[in-house]
């Protein structure tokens, strides 16, 4: 998606669906894994979107923040309260996939690190 074909409703729909998919993926992973995994964090990075653009401002309204790499980043997109890194990664991957498919953004990646 670029500035020419920016559509606020499409961004809102994509972010809402991505959040729902992330929560669902995290719940499924939690049922399978539970708390018996390494502790960690997960997030989604969106590269190539300026934070002062319409798209950037729309993403920021859904919790994205500019990080040190210049990307827009959303921590724990599933909102799951577990410490299990695998559960949080499942949510982050699901969120990133929806943004790629719904908004046509190419540089959307899930990331994680152990605590």
Set out the residue ranges of the language-model regions.
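Ordered hydrophobic segments in well-structured contexts
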Residues: 43-45, 73, 109
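Sequence-level detector for tyrosine residue identity
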Residues: 30, 47, 68, 93-95, ...
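N-terminal leader/targeting segments
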Residues: 1-61
């Amino acid at each position: 998606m670029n500035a020419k074909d920016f559509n606020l409703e499409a961004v809102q729909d994509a972010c809402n669906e991505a959040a729902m998919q992330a929560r669902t993926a995290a719940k499924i992973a939690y049922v399978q894994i539970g708390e018996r995994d390494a502790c960690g964090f997960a997030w989604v990075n969106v590269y190539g979107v300026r934070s002062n653009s319409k798209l950037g401002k729309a993403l920021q309204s859904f919790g994205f923040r500019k990080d040190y790499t210049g990307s827009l980043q959303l921590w724990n997109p599933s909102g799951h309260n577990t410490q299990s890194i695998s559960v949080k990664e499942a949510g982050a991957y699901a969120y990133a996939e929806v943004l790629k498919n719904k908004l046509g953004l190419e540089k959307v990646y899930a990331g994680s690190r152990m605590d």
